[in-house]
Amino acid sequence: MIPSSYPSAEEIARLSARMLLEIGAVNFNTDEPYTLASGLPSPSYIDCRKLISFPRIRSTLMDFMAVTVMRNAGFEAFDNIAGGETAGIPFAALVAERLALPMTYVRKKPKGYGRNARIEGAMSEGERVLLVEDLTTDGGSKLSFVDAIRETGATCGHTAVIFYYDIFPETTKTLGDHGVQLHYLCTWWDVLAEARAQAAFSTETLDEVEKFLRDPRAWQEANKKT
C-alpha cells in the first residue's frame, strides 16, 4: 500500500544511500580495486541483491521505487512489471505488488521458440511494461531486456532501478536513443555524500573514490593491472 505522502526525490536519495550503507551493500577498496564485468578496475562496488535479506529496508526502498515511478511516469502508466533475470526478479515482484499489477520476468537467453521465448509469465501485445532491475552502470544491459519485451508486441519506454552509477555520461543517451527513460533512487554521488556525513570510511578512501567518480576512465587507466 503506497502512503498518501512521501519524501522528496532528494530525501529519497539520501535515505536510500543511508540504507545501502547500513546493510553493507557499499564496498570501497582503493588498495585492491574490484574488477568490473568489463575487466576494468573500480575502487567501488555495490551489491543491491543483499536487500532481499533485510525486510524493513527492502520494503521501504520498494515503496520509494513505486512512488518514484508514479511521480515521474504517472499513476496509470503501466500494465505489467517485468524483472530482468536474475537480480531484477525479486524487486519486480515487490513493485508489482505495490502497484497492483501483473509481474513477469525476462530471461537473458531464450527458452524455446517464438516471440515470447524470453518472457516468463503472461505478457500481451499492447501492454505498457515497466522494466525493473537492481542497478545500471552504462545502461547497455537494459537494452537486451527492452528488446525482448518489445518483441512480444508490448511497449517498454521506462526502466526503474534502485541504484544508478551516474558516472558515465553516455548512459542516459544510450537509453534515450532506445526510447527508454531511466528512474532511480540514488547514485554514487548520494552514497559518497552520506558516507562522508557518517564518516563510514576513511577520508583518504573517500577522496580516492571521488577521484574515480569524477573521471572513471582516467582512474581505471592509472590503476589498470599490467
Swiss-Prot record:
Pathway: Pyrimidine metabolism; UMP biosynthesis via de novo pathway; UMP from orotate: step 1/2. Keywords: Glycosyltransferase, Magnesium, Pyrimidine biosynthesis, Transferase. Transmembrane segments: none annotated. Signal peptide: none annotated. The keyword Magnesium applies. InterPro entries: OPRT, PRibTrfase_dom, PRTase-like. It comes from the Bacteria. 5-phospho-alpha-D-ribose 1-diphosphate binds at R107, K108, K111, E133, D134, L135, T136, T137, D138, G139, G140, S141. GO terms for biological process: 'de novo' UMP biosynthetic process; pyrimidine nucleobase biosynthetic process. It catalyses: orotidine 5'-phosphate + diphosphate = orotate + 5-phospho-alpha-D-ribose 1-diphosphate. One of its GO terms (molecular function) is magnesium ion binding. Its cofactor is Mg(2+). Orotate binds at T137. Its EC number is 2.4.2.10. Pfam families: Pribosyltran. Homodimer. Belongs to the purine/pyrimidine phosphoribosyltransferase family. PyrE subfamily. Catalyzes the transfer of a ribosyl phosphate group from 5-phosphoribose 1-diphosphate to orotate, leading to the formation of orotidine monophosphate (OMP). This is Orotate phosphoribosyltransferase.
